[in-house]
Design a protein with these regions (language model features):
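Solvent-exposed loop/turn segments at secondary-structure junctions
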Residues: 1, 24-25, 45-50, 79-81
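Acidic/histidine-rich, surface-exposed loop or edge segments in extracytoplasmic proteins
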Residues: 9-11, 73, 98-102
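Short, solvent-exposed mixed-charge patches
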Residues: 132-133
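A ligand-binding cleft/hinge motif common to bilobed small-molecule-binding domains
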Residues: 31-56
Length: 133
């Protein structure tokens, strides 16, 4: 919430920040969507709400929220000796934007995580095969 408060000040916005939990935020987002009313939420990716709703990030030319982030796979150096296929897989593995969100939405909608993962793998079998060969 601190960065959001800083952004409101930095951009001179006449908004009121309403701190809440993630579930309260998505509930309010659902209500606003159902009523076709605009809303601004503090969102992050990956998150299932991006697969369910048509959301976009607002521009932040002042970089209040910082630069774009990324995720790296980090492994114990000994793993290369103990499990080379695992290391080879991790070097090839990549999610495209939105793919994690769609799997998260499936689990949010009650699907078991393994079933959601299996469905994603089935839909992207060529790519998954390239990771394990």
């Amino acid at each position: 919430m601190q960065k959001t408060s800083e952004a409101i000040k930095a951009y001179g916005l006449d908004y009121t920040l309403m701190p809440s939990s993630g579930s309260a935020m998505t509930a309010e987002l659902a209500r606003s969507e159902a009523a076709s009313k605009p809303i601004i939420v503090t969102g992050w990716k990956p998150h299932w709400m991006f697969a369910k709703y048509k959301l976009k990030f607002l521009d932040d030319p002042k970089k209040v929220f910082g630069e774009a982030e990324h995720v790296d796979s980090v492994v114990n150096p000994e793993l290369e000796k103990k499990a080379p296929p695992v290391v080879a897989f991790l070097k090839k593995f990549q999610w495209k934007p939105g793919e994690i969100d769609s799997v998260m939405l499936a689990t949010q909608n009650g699907e078991k995580p393994t079933a959601a993962a299996d469905a994603w793998i089935s839909a992207h079998s060529d790519r998954v095969d390239s990771w394990v060969k």
